[in-house]
Design a protein with these regions (language model features):
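Helix-coil boundary and interhelical linker segments in multi-pass alpha-helical membrane proteins
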Residues: 24-41, 92-101, 141-144
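Hydrophobic cores of alpha-helical transmembrane segments in multi-pass inner/ER membrane proteins
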Residues: 19-31, 45-50, 136-138
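Interhelical loop and helix-boundary elements at the membrane-water interface
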Residues: 1-20, 67-79, 115-143
Length: 144
């Protein structure tokens, strides 16, 4: 079950991200007949970023419970560099498709703000910000 999956924190994040992308992006796109691989990759990067930020928030607790995650296995500066790299990758995919518009830039800025300030806010604000980031991405995808 989930208890045994906690020992494999890296795998857990991958599986959670994959299921989230499958349920909230791939299946709806497929059902509507508008499957766009680049958009799917962009969404995957944002979901991965969100999962990694959740890991970072719980890194000390996970380390005490011997749960290995990306956030507690590498230095904080390396972790932040990887998170910023995900946002740059998101922008690069949009640029490659000539779709680097205001919405994409605002999404990336929102992600950068979450990366920058996740450790400084309360647990409640953190939950709202990260889940809000995913909701913001999904809603702007629907209406753009």
């Amino acid at each position: 079950g989930i208890a045994s999956l906690n020992r494999y924190g890296l795998l857990k994040r991958f599986l959670l991200s994959a299921v989230w992308v499958l349920a909230t992006a791939l299946l709806p796109m497929y059902m509507m007949g508008v499957l766009q691989p680049i958009v799917l990759w962009q969404y995957s990067l944002m979901v991965c970023l969100s999962c990694c930020l959740f890991d970072a928030r719980d890194a000390a607790k996970d380390a005490r419970h011997q749960v290995r995650t990306l956030a507690n296995r590498i230095r904080s500066s390396t972790f932040h560099t990887l998170m910023y790299g995900l946002v740059l990758g998101y922008w690069a995919l949009a640029y490659q498709q000539h779709a680097l518009d205001g919405v994409v830039i605002i999404r990336g800025i929102a992600a950068l703000l979450c990366i920058r300030y996740y450790a400084l806010c309360s647990a409640y604000v953190f939950e709202v910000a990260i889940n809000g980031l995913l909701l913001f991405f999904a809603l702007t995808q629907l209406f753009v």
